[in-house]
Amino acid sequence: MCLTAAPSRVSPVAAAAAAAADVAGSSESTVNLMADVDKKDPQYKQIFLERFRKKLQSDKTGMNDLESFVELPEGVAPSAASIGPIKRGSEPLPPWLKLKVPKGMTHRPRFNRIRRSMREKNLSTVCEEAKCPNIGECWGGSDDEGTATATIMVMGSHCTRGCRFCSVLTSRRPPPLDPEEPEKVAAAVHEMGVDYIVMTMVDRDDLPDGGASHVCRCIHTIKEKNPALMLEALVGDFHGDLKLVEQLAVTPLSVYAHNIECVERITPRVRDRRASYKQSLQTLEHVTKSTNGKMLTKSSIMLGLGEEEKEVRQTLRDLRTAGVSAVTLGQYLQPSRTRLKVSRYAHPKEFEMWEKEAMDMGFLYCASGPMVRSSYRAGEYYIKSILKQRQSAEGGKATAAATAANAGAAIA
């Protein structure tokens, strides 16, 4: 049995009936629709569904069909919500994009510990909000002794931007920031017991600084409570304000990540109009310059959005020129029927080719594969080794400097 990364295909009748039943439970007038039908009747749900449809059509609600009320499965026509065969209009996923259902995943202590910690503190994870197909592997680890990674999303679950590839909820006026969030996130990270964490954010263009000061507080609070933790921040462009970018770059981060997402030509079609290819490159380049190359920078590219091979190659070159140290490439998968459709499914061999080319260009690290995402756990193993090597090198320089100073003092 396999679990695909595409939206699950459930019976449209069952989905619509379940949604309609929710409304029925809170509306006396709707409940009266079924006053003459015994609830034990095997056709109860279907009768209710048909009557509810007619009520929507007769009421002046602006919803003249169940498609306005219920999001039908991908590839299912609105007419298929009535009894009849489901017509599948979408192309089936290739074999390499089908995942085996992890056995006993919800019984793994680490998986449950992360999920429980997030729920108790009312925190969001991009793993869930963006419907990442790797959530079981990342949260549970390859085994309970392996590395577990969760990507915590700060500043709420609503983004002010509307990129056409992303499933995160959007809003022009999201709820105000939670002033206690830095403490909650730091406590959650401590409870997870991990040594590497990724923190990402929703864009908050409604805030004067885009939320930069709030993110900085989160970073400092996390590191204060977890000094040995390696912290990666996957952040936005902060309106292109390089002073705000630098404000984050000088925090005690281990990795500064900002995704360019796709090749330049299709950026206006894929990303929100407030984001741009050049702005993302400027953001990454400024992080490198403002930290004298000491900050490890990272970015990500999606394939399957209509890009050409030469454009992917140029994007890799542009990232490397901007000083980016690590890059990931993965297959774009349509998260819902309202998002951009997949133009093609890149073969695993193509991802292998891009990994080799990226390393030949001078990237310190590249994770490239159909199921790879910007925060994919496989990358952290190697990135951790790079960070430890850098820390050792810095420690060695400090020791050498101290030794030289002591020797000079002794001679004097």
UniProtKB/Swiss-Prot annotation:
Pathway(s): Protein modification; protein lipoylation via endogenous pathway; protein N(6)-(lipoyl)lysine from octanoyl-[acyl-carrier-protein]: step 2/2
Domain annotation Radical SAM core: ranges: 142-364
Residues holding [4Fe-4S] cluster 1: 127, 132, 138, 375
EC class (word): transferase
Cofactor section: [4Fe-4S] cluster
Cofactor, free-text remark: Binds 2 [4Fe-4S] clusters per subunit. One cluster is coordinated with 3 cysteines and an exchangeable S-adenosyl-L-methionine.
Gene Ontology CC annotations of this record: mitochondrion
Stored Pfam families: LIAS_N (PF16881), Radical_SAM (PF04055)
Catalytic activity of the protein: [[Fe-S] cluster scaffold protein carrying a second [4Fe-4S](2+) cluster] + N(6)-octanoyl-L-lysyl-[protein] + 2 oxidized [2Fe-2S]-[ferredoxin] + 2 S-adenosyl-L-methionine + 4 H(+) = [[Fe-S] cluster scaffold protein] + N(6)-[(R)-dihydrolipoyl]-L-lysyl-[protein] + 4 Fe(3+) + 2 hydrogen sulfide + 2 5'-deoxyadenosine + 2 L-methionine + 2 reduced [2Fe-2S]-[ferredoxin]
Positions with a binding annotation for [4Fe-4S] cluster 2: 159, 163, 166
Miscellaneous comment as given in the Swiss-Prot or TrEMBL entry: This protein may be expected to contain an N-terminal transit peptide but none has been predicted.
HAMAP family xref list: Lipoyl_synth (MF_00206)
UniProt protein name: Lipoyl synthase, mitochondrial
Native source organism of the sequence: Leishmania infantum
